[in-house]
C-alpha cells in the first residue's frame, strides 16, 4: 500500500472542483474496467462536516432541535435551485489507479493554500499557506512518486455523466418480497407517527425561481433569523420593483419563488445598509405528477417554504419567531386549554424561558408518498420585561425567585447588601451584547405611600427606551456625574428629574454608551429601573451551571405528551390562542393549492421475539418485552460464562490456559484547581471488588474472608506538583511487582482504579492545564498495557456494600468484566431464535464489523493542538463465533473526513484476529456503518465494499465471503407513538416496546430500510434507529433475517443489562473511536511535556502516532468500554 502526498498527481489523482484542489487517493490500487486507468472527478458541493450531520437537503447538517428543511439530503450541489449558484458536474481523468471521492472539509486549519496534504489525508495541495502546523506538498520517503497533475496536457480531463461513474452504477439491495409485518412472526400492532400526507395541486402551477443573497451592513448573511425579517422589510420598501409582497415565497436563506416574473431578471436593491441581490434561475411547474427523482428531491424545499411562510412572516406583536430551522411559538399563556398537561413555555433561571418550536421535514421518497414530518424543539428566550433586580436574585439563589419569595426575603436583604465581585462578574456575562430597556413604568421601587410596587410589564405600545448593555458601574448613590455644572449622583438625579426615590441605591448602575456628542463617556441607569426588553428574543449568552440539565428536565415531554402536541399541530388547531404553524386555510397554502392531511399516518408494526441470554449458571428470556433484566443484582448474582475467567488463547496455541485473577491499585488524581488532599472510600473499592468476585471473576484478596481486596499500589497525583513521569513510575512498579502475587495456573491481571477529584474535562484546556484522564489512558492502556477504570471521588463515596442498592456498582462490574475480557453473557445459539442460530453457525462463521469516525469538537478545531484537530477512524470486529467479544483498531485521518483513509489495513487486522482466535475464515462479513446520510451511500458503499473484496482476495483467491453493508442512523425526525397506551408500560413512559419493527409507509421506496425501536427508559420519547441494508450477498436466509438479527445484537452490549438503542458493534465503534480521540490528546500532552517533536508530514512519525493510539497488543479485553 502506498501513499501519495504530492500536490496533485501520480497514480489515482482525484480532482475535486468544489475547492479547485487536487486529492490523491491511491488507497486501494484498484483498476477499473476501463483498461485499469479510469478515475473520476466530482465537484458536488459537500458542506462542512458536522458530527451531528443528518439527512437535511439544505446544508447536509443536522441539529436535533434545528431543522425545518427536507430530510432527503442529496446534497449534490444543486445550488441553482436550492442553494444558489453552481450546478453539478463530473469529470474524470485517465489515470493508472482508481480515485475515490474525498470530502474536503475545511475547518479553517489553513494547512496550505490548497488545503494541505498529509499522509493521514487524501487531500493533496501545494505547500504553503498559514495557520496549520501540518503542511503538504512534498513526498515523504517510502511513498508514491509524484506524477503529472491530472488534467495536464498529457492527461486531459474529459466530461463524463454522473451515471457513468462506477460508484453510481452499482445497485442497492432489494427489499424482500414479503415483509415481517405480513408474516406470522412476533406480535402485530398499529402505531401513530409524526408524519402526515401532503397533496400537491392536481393542475401544475407555474412558479419562477430566484436566487437571493441578503446583505446586512455590507456583509452577506445566511442566518434565517436575520435574513427573513430583513428580506420582507426590503421588499416593502421596493414596491415599485416587486409589487405586493404577498405574491412571494422566501425560504429565509437564499431562494425566492413567485407566480409573476420580474421585469428585471437580476438586480440589487438600493438601500446601502440593507439590501439583497436577486437573480432569475428558471421556471418550474409545481404540482401534477412528478416522477423525476431530482425534481422530487428539490421539491421538498419549496413545499416547506410554502407551508411555513405565514408563520415565518415578521409580525408585530410577534406570534412566531424563526431561529435556524425551527419556528418558535411566542405565546403569553404557557398552556393550551385542550392540552392541560403540556407546557408550551417553561420558566428557567436568569430571566429566561424555554419556548417550544416546530420543525417540518418534507420527505418525497417514502412509500406512503410525499409526507411532512413534524418535530419539536426548545430554545431559550428572554422573559418579557424581566427586571434586572430579579435577575440578581436568581443569580444569588441559583433558582427562579418568585414574587412571594422576593417580597418576603430579598426585598429587605437587597437594600442592605453589597453585591459580590463574583455575582457582578456573572451578571456581566449574562448581559453582555444584550439589548435592555429603561422605563419608569417597570422595575421594583417604592410608591408614594411607601408600599413596594412591582409594576407589570409594559405593553408593546409603551416598551420603554432600548439600549445596548456596556457594563456595570458603581452603586447609584456613589456614581457621580456633572449636570449643568452641578455634581450629582445617579440616585439624586432620578429623584430630581423623575421624582423617583430609589429603593436600592446601593446596587450597581447599568451602563450604556453615551451619544457621540458626549464623548466616550457612559450613561448610567439604576439597576432597578432596567429590565429585559418587552419582545421575547432568543437568548444565546452565558448560562448558569446546570441550566442545560435543568432545561432538558423541564422540556422533556413524555411520549404521550409529545404525541398529543404533535397530533394537535398536525390537526391544524390553534395553540394558546395563536394560529397553528401550518394551516390549509392560510393564503399561501390556498394560493398554491397545497394541502396537508389533518391526521397522522398510521403504520403497521411488529414486536419481534427477543433472544435468550445465556450466563454461566442461568438464562434469561425477555418474554414480556421489558428490555431489562438483572445480573449483578440477581439472587444469586449471575455468573460469567464457563471458561471466561481463563486468558483467551490463540487457536493454534498449545499453551495451557491460565486463570485470570484481578489485582487492583489506586491512583488518586487531584484537580489542579484544588489544593486539598482527598481520601477515597476504601469500603467502596472493596465493595466493587467483592461484586466482581461474586459474578465469577476471581480477585486477589488480602484476607481469607474476602473482606479486603489487595491494593497493589497507591499514588496521589496533582499535575501542578508532579510530572507525568510520576505516573509512569507508578505503572512500571505495578508491572515489575506482579510476579510476587502470581500462583500456579494463574495470571495476575492488574487494574488501576483512577479516582478523580473532578472531571478532567472541567479544567483541561485552561491555564495550561491538561486532561489527566486522557494522559492516563494513553500511558496505562496503550504504552504499558495495564487496565484502568475511572471513577469520581464523590461517586466512589456513595458506593454501598450491596450492589442491589447501588446502580453504580452494577455498572462498574459490567465495565470491568468487559475490559479484562471476561465474558459475562452471550446469546443462545440453537434455541427458538432461528436467525441468530444461522448468524452464529460455527460451520459458516460471521465476522461483524462496526465502523465509526470520531471528529474533533468545535473547541478542538478552533483551539486544540495539532492532534486534537484530527479525526480518528475506528473499526471493531468480533473475534469469537458467538459475536460477543470485539477488538478495535484505529487510524488518524484529516479533520472531518468520514471515509476511512486506510480501511484496507483495518480489514486485514479484523480478519486476521478473527482467524487467529477461531481458526476459521469468516463465511460472512457484515458491516454496520454509522455516520452516513443518503447522499453518501453510493460513494462509501462502493469504496468500502470493494476494499473488503480486495483484501479477501489478497488472502486467497478462493476466499469470497458474502458481504452485507448496513447503514445505521438516528439522525432523523421520525417518531412512533402507541395508539393504545395500554399496550405499553408506565415504567417505560408508555413508549413503544423494545423490539418494535416498522417497515412500511414511512420507509423509503428506493432502499431496503426499516425502523427498529429497542431503547428503554422512563423519560422522554425514544427516537427509533433507522437501518438501510444497502448491499447483501448472503443467500438462503429468511426474509426477516436482518431485522431480527439486528434486534438480537441490541441485547449484546456488555456494559448494560438493558437493551440499547444501537447494535452492540456500533456502540463499541462509538466508544472505541471516542477513546482513540482522547488518546490522541494524551499522546500530544505526553510528547509536549517531554519535548518530543511530532511531525505528521513525516511518514515515520505518522506511523508512530497510529501505533501509539491503539491499545497495547498484550492487553486482553474490550478496553474501550
Curated annotation (Swiss-Prot):
GO MF annotation terms: DEAD/H-box RNA helicase binding; miRNA binding; RNA endonuclease activity; single-stranded RNA binding; siRNA binding
Region spans: Disordered: 1-134
SMART domains: PAZ (SM00949), Piwi (SM00950)
InterPro entries (UniProt xref): PAZ_dom, PAZ_dom_sf, Piwi, Piwi_ago-like, RNaseH-like_sf, RNaseH_sf
Keywords: Cytoplasm, Repressor, RNA-mediated gene silencing, Translation regulation
CDD domains, A to Z: PAZ_argonaute_like, Piwi_ago-like
Protein name as catalogued: Piwi-like protein ergo-1
Species lineage: Eukaryota, Metazoa, Ecdysozoa, Nematoda, Chromadorea
Gene responsible for this protein: ergo-1
Amino acid at each position: 500500500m502506498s501513499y501519495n502526498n504530492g500536490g496533485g498527481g501520480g497514480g489515482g489523482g482525484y480532482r475535486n472542483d468544489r475547492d479547485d484542489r487536487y486529492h490523491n487517493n491511491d488507497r486501494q490500487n484498484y483498476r477499473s474496467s476501463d483498461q485499469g486507468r479510469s478515475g473520476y472527478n466530482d465537484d458536488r458541493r459537500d458542506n462542512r462536516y458536522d458530527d451531528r450531520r443528518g439527512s437535511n437537503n439544505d446544508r447536509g447538517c443536522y441539529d436535533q432541535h434545528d431543522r425545518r428543511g427536507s430530510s432527503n439530503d442529496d446534497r449534490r450541489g444543486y445550488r441553482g435551485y436550492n442553494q444558489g449558484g453552481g450546478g453539478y458536474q463530473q469529470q474524470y481523468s485517465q489515470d493508472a489507479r482508481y480515485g475515490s471521492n474525498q470530502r474536503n472539509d475545511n475547518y479553517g486549519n489553513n494547512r496550505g493554500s490548497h488545503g494541505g496534504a498529509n499522509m493521514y489525508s487524501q487531500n493533496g495541495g501545494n505547500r504553503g499557506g498559514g495557520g496549520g502546523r501540518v503542511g503538504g506538498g512534498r513526498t515523504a520517503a517510502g511513498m508514491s512518486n509524484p506524477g503529472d497533475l491530472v488534467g495536464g496536457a498529457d492527461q486531459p480531463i474529459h466530461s463524463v455523466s454522473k451515471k457513468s461513474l462506477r460508484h453510481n452504477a452499482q445497485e442497492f439491495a432489494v427489499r424482500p418480497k414479503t415483509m415481517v409485518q405480513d408474516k406470522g412472526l412476533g406480535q402485530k400492532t398499529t402505531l401513530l407517527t409524526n408524519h402526515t400526507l401532503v397533496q400537491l395541486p392536481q393542475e401544475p402551477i407555474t412558479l419562477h425561481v430566484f436566487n437571493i443573497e441578503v446583505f446586512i451592513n455590507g456583509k452577506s448573511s445566511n442566518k434565517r433569523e436575520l435574513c427573513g425579517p430583513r428580506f420582507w422589510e426590503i421588499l416593502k420598501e421596493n414596491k415599485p420593483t416587486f409589487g405586493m409582497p404577498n405574491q412571494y415565497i422566501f425560504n429565509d436563506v437564499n431562494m425566492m419563488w413567485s407566480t409573476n416574473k420580474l421585469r428585471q431578471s437580476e438586480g440589487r436593491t438600493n438601500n446601502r445598509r440593507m439590501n439583497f441581490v436577486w437573480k432569475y434561475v428558471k421556471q418550474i411547474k409545481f404540482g401534477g405528477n412528478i416522477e423525476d427523482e431530482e425534481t422530487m428531491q428539490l421539491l421538498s424545499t419549496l413545499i416547506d417554504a410554502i407551508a411555513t411562510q405565514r408563520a415565518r412572516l415578521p409580525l408585530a406583536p410577534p406570534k412566531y419567531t424563526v431561529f435556524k430551522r425551527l419556528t418558535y411559538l411566542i405565546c403569553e399563556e404557557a398552556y393550551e386549554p385542550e392540552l392541560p398537561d403540556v407546557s408550551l413555555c417553561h420558566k428557567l433561571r436568569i430571566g429566561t424561558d424555554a419556548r417550544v418550536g416546530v420543525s417540518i421535514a418534507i420527505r418525497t421518497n417514502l412509500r406512503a408518498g410525499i409526507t411532512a414530518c413534524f418535530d419539536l424543539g426548545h430554545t431559550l428566550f428572554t422573559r418579557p420585561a424581566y427586571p434586572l433586580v430579579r435577575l440578581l436574585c436568581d443569580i444569588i439563589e441559583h433558582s427562579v425567585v418568585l414574587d412571594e419569595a422576593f417580597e418576603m426575603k430579598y426585598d429587605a436583604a437587597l437594600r442592605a447588601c453589597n453585591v459580590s465581585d463574583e455575582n457582578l462578574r456573572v451578571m456581566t456575562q449574562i448581559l453582555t451584547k444584550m439589548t435592555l430597556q429603561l422605563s419608569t413604568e417597570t422595575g421594583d421601587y417604592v410608591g408614594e405611600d411607601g408600599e413596594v410596587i412591582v409594576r407589570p410589564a409594559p405593553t408593546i405600545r409603551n416598551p420603554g427606551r432600548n439600549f445596548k448593555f456596556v457594563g456595570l458601574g458603581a452603586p447609584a448613590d456613589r456614581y457621580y456625574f456633572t449636570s449643568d455644572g452641578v455634581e450629582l449622583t445617579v440616585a439624586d438625579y432620578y429623584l430630581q428629574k423623575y421624582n423617583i426615590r430609589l429603593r436600592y441605591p446601593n446596587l450597581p448602575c447599568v451602563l450604556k454608551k453615551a451619544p457621540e456628542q458626549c464623548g466616550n463617556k457612559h450613561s448610567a441607569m439604576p439597576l432597578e429601573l432596567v429590565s429585559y426588553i418587552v419582545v421575547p428574543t432568543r437568548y444565546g449568552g452565558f448560562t448558569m451551571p446546570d441550566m442545560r440539565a435543568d432545561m432538558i428536565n423541564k422540556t422533556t415531554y413524555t411520549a404521550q405528551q409529545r404525541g398529543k402536541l404533535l397530533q394537535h399541530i398536525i390537526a391544524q388547531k390553534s395553540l394558546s390562542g395563536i394560529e397553528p404553524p401550518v394551516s390549509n386555510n392560510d393564503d399561501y397554502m390556498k394560493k398554491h393549492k397545497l394541502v396537508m392531511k389533518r391526521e397522522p399516518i398510521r403504520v403497521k408494526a411488529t414486536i419481534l421475539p427477543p433472544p435468550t441470554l445465556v450466563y454461566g449458571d442461568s438464562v434469561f428470556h425477555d418474554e414480556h418485552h421489558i428490555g431489562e433484566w438483572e445480573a449483578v443484582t440477581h439472587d444469586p448474582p449471575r455468573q460469567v460464562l464457563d471458561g471466561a475467567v481463563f486468558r483467551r488463547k490463540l487457536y493454534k496455541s498449545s499453551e495451557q490456559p491460565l486463570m485470570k485473577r484481578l489485582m487492583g491499585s489506586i491512583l488518586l488524581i487531584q484537580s489542579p484547581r484544588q489544593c486539598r488532599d482527598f481520601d477515597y472510600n476504601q469500603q467502596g473499592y472493596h465493595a466493587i471488588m467483592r461484586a466482581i468476585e461474586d459474578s465469577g471473576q476471581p480477585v486477589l484478596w488480602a484476607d481469607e474472608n474476602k473482606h479486603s481486596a489487595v491494593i497493589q499500589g497507591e499514588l496521589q497525583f496533582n499535575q501542578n506538583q508532579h510530572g507525568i513521569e510520576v505516573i509512569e513510575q507508578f505503572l512500571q512498579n505495578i508491572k515489575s511487582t506482579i510476579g510476587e502475587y502470581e500462583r500456579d495456573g494463574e495470571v495476575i491481571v492488574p487494574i488501576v482504579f483512577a479516582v478523580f477529584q473532578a472531571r478532567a474535562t472541567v479544567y483541561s484546556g485552561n491555564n495550561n492545564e491538561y486532561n489527566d484522564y486522557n494522559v492516563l489512558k494513553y500511558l496505562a492502556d496503550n504504552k504499558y498495557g495495564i487496565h484502568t477504570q475511572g471513577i469520581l471521588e464523590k461517586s466512589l463515596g456513595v458506593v454501598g456494600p450491596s450492589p442491589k442498592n447501588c446502580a453504580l456498582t452494577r455498572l462498574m462490574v459490567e465495565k470491568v468484566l468487559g475490559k479484562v475480557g471476561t465474558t459475562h453473557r452471550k446469546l443462545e445459539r440453537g434455541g427458538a431464535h432461528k436467525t441468530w442460530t444461522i448468524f452464529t453457525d460455527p460451520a459458516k462463521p460471521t465476522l461483524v464489523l462496526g465502523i465509526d469516525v470520531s471528529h474533533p469538537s468545535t473547541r478542538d478545531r478552533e483551539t486544540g493542538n495539532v492532534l486534537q484537530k484530527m479525526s480518528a477512524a475506528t473499526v471493531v470486529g468480533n473475534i469469537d463465533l458467538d459475536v460477543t467479544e470485539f477488538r478495535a483498531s484505529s487510524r488518524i485521518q484529516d479533520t472531518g473526513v468520514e471515509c476511512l483513509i486506510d480501511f484496507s489495513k483495518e480489514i486485514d487486522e479484523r480478519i486476521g484476529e478473527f482467524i487467529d482466535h477461531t481458526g476459521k475464515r469468516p463465511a460472512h462479513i457484515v458491516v454496520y456503518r454509522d455516520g452516513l446520510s443518503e447522499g453518501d451511500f453510493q460513494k462509501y458503499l462502493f469504496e468500502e465494499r470493494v476494499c473488503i473484496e480486495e483484501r479477501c482476495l489478497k488472502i486467497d483467491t478462493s476466499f469470497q465471503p458474502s458481504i452485507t453493508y448496513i447503514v445505521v442512523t438516528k439522525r432523523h425526525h421520525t417518531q412512533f407513538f402507541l395508539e393504545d397506551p395500554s399496550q405499553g408500560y408506565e415504567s417505560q413512559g408508555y413508549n413503544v416496546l423494545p423490539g418494535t419493527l416498522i417497515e412500511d409507509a414511512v420507509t423509503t421506496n428506493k432502499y431496503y430500510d426499516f425502523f427498529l425501536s429497542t431503547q428503554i427508559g422512563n423519560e422522554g420519547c425514544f427516537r427509533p434507529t433507522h437501518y438501510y441494508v444497502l448491499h447483501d450477498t448472503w443467500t438462503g436466509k429468511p426474509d426477516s433475517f436482518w431485522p431480527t438479527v439486528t434486534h438480537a445484537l441490541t441485547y449484546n452490549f456488555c456494559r448494560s443489562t438493558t437493551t440499547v438503542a444501537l447494535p452492540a458493534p456500533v456502540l463499541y465503534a462509538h466508544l472505541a473511536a471516542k477513546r482513540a480521540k482522547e488518546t490522541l490528546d494524551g499522546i500530544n500532552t505526553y510528547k509536549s511535556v517531554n519535548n518530543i517533536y511530532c511531525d505528521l508530514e513525516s511518514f515515520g512519525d505518522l506511523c508512530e502516532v497510529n501505533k501509539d493510539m491503539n491499545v497495547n497488543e498484550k492487553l486482553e479485553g474490550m478496553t474501550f468500554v
